[in-house]
Amino acid sequence: MSKKPKVASNTIALNKRARHEYFIEEEIEAGLELQGWEVKSLRAGKANIGDSYVTFRNGEAFLFGGTITPLNVASTHIVCDPTRTRKLLLNKRELDTLYGKVSRDGFTVVALSLYWKNAWAKVKIGLAKGKKLHDKREDIKDREWQVAKQRIMKNANR
């Protein structure tokens, strides 16, 4: 008999604050250029993308602010930098559209989630526009109203 495949979440890290701070206009999947110790740390779930964003240099995109904590058993002859900038692997067309919108339209690009797709580590990046304080309050009111509405409907059906 063959073994059943493990049912596990493919998500490594989430940036929940990004959806609170920004309006996400578009989401794009990008690959990451990683070193060996980083892949081992990601498999252990030691990643944080809470303050990460994307910048453009020489026609390439780089992820800044993402932290991958090295494992204790990492190699001694390799210097592990947890906060190094990591190159994003995107198509030329995707790079051009993102760069154009960021430079002209006042958008920013933030990391939304880090996950496994087959054996590859991928990052979902979002083209985002910053929210004002009143927008955040409006979102909170809408969320609270949805919860209250569900509660009312649940009690009405009894």
Curated annotation (Swiss-Prot):
PROSITE patterns assigned: SSRP
A GO cellular-component term linked to this record: cytosol
Signal peptide annotation: none
Transmembrane segments: none
UniProt key word RNA-binding: yes
Keyword RNA-binding recorded: yes
Localisation: Cytoplasm
Keywords for the protein's UniProt record, in alphabetical order: Cytoplasm, RNA-binding
First-listed, main subcellular location of the protein, grouped into a coarse class: cytoplasm
Pfam families in the record: SmpB (PF01668)
GO process annotations (BP): trans-translation
GO MF entries: RNA binding
InterPro entries for this protein: SmpB, SsrA-bd_prot, SsrA-bd_prot_CS
Stated role: Required for rescue of stalled ribosomes mediated by trans-translation. Binds to transfer-messenger RNA (tmRNA), required for stable association of tmRNA with ribosomes. tmRNA and SmpB together mimic tRNA shape, replacing the anticodon stem-loop with SmpB. tmRNA is encoded by the ssrA gene; the 2 termini fold to resemble tRNA(Ala) and it encodes a 'tag peptide', a short internal open reading frame. During trans-translation Ala-aminoacylated tmRNA acts like a tRNA, entering the A-site of stalled ribosomes, displacing the stalled mRNA.
Family recorded in the similarity comment: Belongs to the SmpB family.
Protein name in the entry: SsrA-binding protein
Annotated source species: Glaesserella parasuis serovar 5 (strain SH0165) (Haemophilus parasuis)
Lineage, highest ranks first: Bacteria, Pseudomonadati, Pseudomonadota, Gammaproteobacteria, Pasteurellales
